[in-house]
């Protein structure tokens, strides 16, 4: 879909305060990013900024072009704030850049749409497989067009947990993972592949890493809290926050036994 077509659709039909086709430019953006990074994988760091890869710059260039053409304001991990518009897209062009550059097949494009301080839509595409998680506020969550729900696991001792960083201790899990792409790991909690995802204590995530995934998680029936077990605030496109994700029952159980 051309950028001009997307502009017209966003100015047209609405569901509440959300354009009917708000996910269309996000899909186009993710697909074009996937195509763009192929030739840059394995090139290493860009030298522009610490831990920034050549593939990050290539992906960001695509994101700014596609999203700017759709008249979004953009908040990107790679280039900061650009453009203007009623809707803001918070984007991590490639979440899991090291995985992508080194050939580990677990990395994603994360795109969250905000209207003011309200999170209204999100898309996370696994660029290694092409699988796509999507949600609009109040409309449920899907993976490749099929509705998703969390695992329903309620026992800490039977849970498969994933973390960003090293947990302070064994938290009673059955199995543990560290996969390296937060947005995608949150989505795997949303569809029941994982039971829990969290950051190590005293760590936080940037909003481009968690906003899209958290909307998908919530629309699927999961919850996200901070370390105190309080519901996570998703009203800011720039504030880093601690994140813990699971089903409501499992998070309550983890808090009660001191696992978080």
Regions found by a protein language model. Give the residues of each.
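Structural motif
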Residues: 115, 143-144
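Short secondary-structure junctions
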Residues: 42-46, 71-74, 141, 173-180, ...
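An extended, acidic
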Residues: 30, 148-260
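Well-ordered beta-strand scaffold positions
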Residues: 79, 139, 146-147
């Amino acid at each position: 879909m051309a950028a001009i077509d997307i502009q017209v659709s966003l100015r047209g039909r609405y569901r509440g305060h959300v354009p009917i086709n708000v996910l269309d430019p996000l899909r186009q953006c993710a697909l074009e990013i996937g195509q763009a990074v192929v030739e840059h994988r394995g090139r290493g760091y860009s030298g522009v900024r610490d831990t920034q890869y050549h593939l990050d710059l290539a992906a960001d260039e695509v994101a700014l072009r596609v999203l700017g053409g759709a008249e979004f304001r953009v908040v990107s991990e790679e280039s900061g704030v650009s453009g203007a518009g009623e809707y803001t897209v918070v984007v991590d062009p490639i979440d899991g850049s090291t995985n992508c550059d080194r050939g580990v097949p677990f990395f994603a494009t994360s795109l969250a749409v905000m209207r003011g301080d309200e999170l209204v839509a999100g898309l996370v595409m696994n660029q290694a497989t092409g699988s796509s998680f999507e949600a609009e506020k109040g409309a449920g969550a899907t993976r490749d067009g099929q509705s998703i729900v969390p695992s329903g696991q309620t026992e800490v001792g039977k849970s498969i947990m994933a973390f960003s960083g090293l947990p302070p201790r064994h938290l009673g899990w059955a199995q543990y993972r560290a996969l390296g792409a937060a947005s995608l790991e949150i989505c795997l909690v949303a569809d029941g592949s994982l039971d829990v995802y969290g950051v190590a204590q005293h760590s936080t995530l940037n909003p481009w890493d968690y906003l899209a995934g958290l909307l998908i998680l919530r629309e699927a029936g999961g919850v996200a809290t901070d370390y105190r077990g309080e519901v996570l605030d998703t009203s800011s496109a720039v504030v880093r926050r601690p994140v813990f994700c699971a089903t409501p029952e499992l998070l309550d159980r983890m808090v009660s036994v001191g696992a978080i």
